Amino acid sequence: MAVKTVVLGLDGADHDFIGAMIAEGELPNFRRLRSAGAAHEIENDPGQGNVQFWTGAAIGAGPGWHGHYFYLQFDPKTYDIVMDYDIGLPEVTPFWETLDKEGYRAAVVDWYEMPVKPLKNGVVIHRWFAHEPLTHTEFHPPEMAEVAARYAASDPIAEGFASQPREGAEALTEFFDRLLSRIDIKASFYADQIRETDWDLYVACFSEAHNAGHYYIQLEDETHALHDPQLADELRHPLRRCYRELDKGIGKVLDAAGPDANIFMVGGPSMGKFISANSALGEIARRVDLGWNAPRSGAETAKETYHSLIPQGLRRRLAPLARLVRRKVASSDYKHRRFFAVPHNDNAGAIRINMKGREKYGVVSRGAEYDAVVKEIAEGVSSFKNPETGRSIVGRVVDVAREFDGPHRDLLPDVFIEWDRTGTHGDFTHLASEKFGEVSLPRQTRTGDHGPTGYFWAPHSNLASPERPACVTDHILRAVRSAGPTSQQRL
């Protein structure tokens, strides 16, 4: 059997970290791929995280063309915060569905957070060994579940890192070893599938760099405020071990694909220190909207009490209660507000404006009033400073109406606020504004978070540099179509 094109997807992989290990003589398979063609860095869309990075790379479009920005989305009809799969997002067509309609045989395993549709000629597996176990695995066709079970009866980290406190070498090592075991399981599955079936396209994704970056980066980054050199030695530098295992897994896939296959790699978004004001943005937005001394509502007081009483490690188990609190705040309070914070990736905060004609109880008109509110938000949030640096916590304010186009732009928050992470060694703990007072932030479970860049490696040295994730799609489509007749035509 033969495969014409392979796309390796490395969720959360950091291009600079890979490059540094290659320069030290490690990661031979990464080096082999990078030197075989073109290697480009990709800048993510402004204020965006994993969802847009991977969705954009799959469908060839920016966030305004699909409206999907986070796994939790705001519903303007109810003011509720709901799971992305419950809100009825617009249908999108990733590159593998386009190829499937043209008669190509494709397999796609664990592409990050894409709506799942069965393929006529191929295989789709969604959330088999994903970054976080938010939903059950979907297998199309269903019999692929039995095939996958031969390699692992269940996800070795199915409960997720944050399901319980994990401190000390023993607890961190136990979870990390299970995380690494997933790489070999998936690599073996991919290699066997590639050898056993005639594929036009095989998309093989790994998410382990994502998990390792969120929870173990402080053991690799000596400038991190939480760096513990003794613990790093006890765990034998886990990030390096993760990338070495990924390199071995990639080697298995490359050997199975053979020398004639086109090999692409998409990775990112990058990883760095966790530095975010998202946990305080709800309170910051309230003060900017209503004033420093405005009394909290009963719903907001309940939310604050929940966060003060429930330890971070228990919140995943109590997620239904958290959603109830969130709904109470949204339905009771947000309809009376001009703007409010909504959940988003930690690299940037997100604020929704209560717009007339869009939100059920909208109060802000489009045009001059909207522009004035955006300016007020930008100035208000920017007035909060990080005491460690003396600078504003805001690196960039993204006005969605001006930055993004597309028919589904109204599904997005109206303002994204990228946090200024320069010169800071650890997460924000205390913020201060001369106008709006002081805000304290709780300690987060994660120690690492995503940066603004990813990368795209292609087997063609004359490849034009892709500027955004959306530019990846055309290159892959062109490679598959130019590789010859479809598997169906060859039959």
Positions of the model-derived regions?
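Secreted, luminal/periplasmic, and some membrane-associated catalytic domains
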Residues: L10, G19, E24-G25, R32-E43, ...
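Glycine-rich loop at the start of a catalytic domain that most often binds anionic cofactors/ligands
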Residues: I22, Q52-G62, S279
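Alpha-helical packing segments of well-folded alpha/beta enzyme cores
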Residues: F95, R182, K186-Q193, L235, ...
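Active-site His/acidic residue clusters
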Residues: E196-R241, E245, A277, N347-A348, ...
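Low-complexity, glycine/alanine/valine/leucine- and proline-rich hydrophobic stretches
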Residues: E418-P466, V472-T473
